[in-house]
């Protein structure tokens, strides 16, 4: 941590000299700045903080003092963990102001740009640590404390979706207040109606409540923002499936399969939808595709039943034999082969598998 805090100490004189033309200080202000720099270089953060604050009294926009106070606040947050959120908030505020002041300099130098990159990284770090502190409190079961810290994280970065989504979850899961959870999501969407994360959250909220017609509106809107999001296409399909609009459910699933043709969840969904549509041919095709990727007894069993229903004896023989070769102890597969062979007039094959069946336990 000392390295983080004092890495730039050697540059203090250079930075101070560069800033004087832009950021005037009174004679006493200059004395306070030099005194603060000395204490800072000696790693006496408490005294350095006192004198950097005095510099800000003389010039509230003094970038060097703001940056150093941000660094000191980061240092304190890591060493005084009981007050880490307080110190990370201070660091965030100091860096925010220093960044704002620097960005408004009449002409940015290369050093200014380097400083801005560094300050933005540190500001982001401070915010991330606040968010992580809230997550820790939530995991520990300290709901109220977590709520307060997530609210702070949202106040500091109102455009970041994560804190408000976490607050929604707290109200929904921990506090059991669906009305407040819905209110939070509506507020977020009112502010940014096209934000993908908010649309997905709102759709999920209504889906979990069983309001599939409302849920699909938000998932469809999210699809406009990201047409190739497979998870969202599955959401849309699931909504239409629950609404018994199987044609639309199949359209969404097929679109997703164009993106991920070997996605087993999608193939299973497509097969299930085809069954609901009484479309035996489509169901059979999806079952075959599933078996090409992951042979399993349930899929073989369903496919065999479908092929038997269609009286497609040659295909039934093919897949029942494949089933038997995959599991030579499976008597049902053998019986399907025998039946299909008999129906298709293949006596030799029927005899062969009848003998195999007779030898089975």
Functional labels for PLM-detected ranges:
Residues 2, 18-114, 122-128, 132, ...:
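N-terminal leader/linker segments that initiate helical-solenoid repeat arrays
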Residues 28-30, 63-64, 106, 127, ...:
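Helix-start (N-cap) detector for alpha-helical repeat units in TPR-like alpha-solenoids
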Residues 37, 71, 78, 135, ...:
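Residue-level recognition of tetratricopeptide repeat
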Residues 41, 75-76, 139, 173-174, ...:
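Register position in tetratricopeptide repeats
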Residues 55, 98, 152-153, 187-188, ...:
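Canonical positions in the second alpha-helix
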Residues 58, 101, 105-108, 156, ...:
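Structural marker of alpha-solenoid helical repeat scaffolds
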Residues 68, 111, 122, 132, ...:
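Canonical tetratricopeptide repeat
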């Amino acid at each position: 941590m000392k390295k983080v805090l004092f890495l730039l100490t050697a540059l203090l004189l250079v930075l101070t000299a560069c800033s004087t033309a832009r950021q005037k200080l009174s004679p006493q202000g200059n004395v306070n700045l030099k005194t603060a720099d000395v204490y800072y270089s000696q790693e006496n953060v408490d005294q350095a903080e006192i004198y950097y604050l005095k510099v800000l009294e003389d010039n509230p926009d003094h970038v060097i003092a703001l940056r150093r106070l941000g660094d000191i606040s980061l240092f304190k947050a890591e060493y005084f963990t009981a007050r880490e959120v307080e110190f990370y908030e201070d660091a965030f505020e100091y860096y925010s102001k220093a960044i704002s002041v620097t960005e408004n300099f009449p002409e940015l130098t290369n050093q200014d740009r380097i400083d801005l990159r560094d300050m933005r990284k540190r500001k982001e770090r401070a915010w991330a640590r606040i968010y992580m502190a809230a997550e820790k409190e939530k995991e520990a079961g300290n709901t109220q404390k977590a709520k307060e810290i997530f609210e702070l994280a949202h106040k500091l970065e109102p455009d970041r979706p994560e804190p408000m989504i976490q607050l929604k979850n707290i109200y929904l899961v921990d506090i059991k207040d669906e009305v407040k959870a819905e209110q939070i999501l509506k507020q977020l969407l009112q502010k940014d109606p096209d934000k993908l994360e908010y649309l997905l959250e709102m759709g999920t909220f209504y889906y979990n409540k069983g309001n599939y017609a409302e849920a699909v509106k938000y998932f469809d809107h999210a699809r406009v923002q990201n047409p190739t999001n497979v998870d969202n296409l599955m959401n849309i399909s699931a909504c239409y499936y629950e609404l018994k609009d199987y044609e639309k459910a199949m359209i969404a699933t097929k679109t997703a399969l164009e993106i991920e043709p070997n996605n087993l969840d999608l193939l299973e969904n497509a097969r299930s939808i085809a069954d609901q549509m009484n479309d035996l041919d489509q169901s059979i095709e999806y079952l075959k595709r599933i078996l090409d990727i992951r042979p399993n007894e349930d899929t073989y069993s369903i496919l065999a039943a479908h092929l038997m229903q269609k009286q497609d004896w040659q295909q039934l023989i093919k897949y029942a034999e494949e089933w038997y070769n995959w599991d030579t102890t499976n008597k049902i597969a053998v019986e399907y082969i025998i039946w299909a062979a008999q129906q298709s007039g293949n006596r030799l094959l029927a005899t062969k598998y009848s003998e195999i069946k007779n030898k089975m336990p």
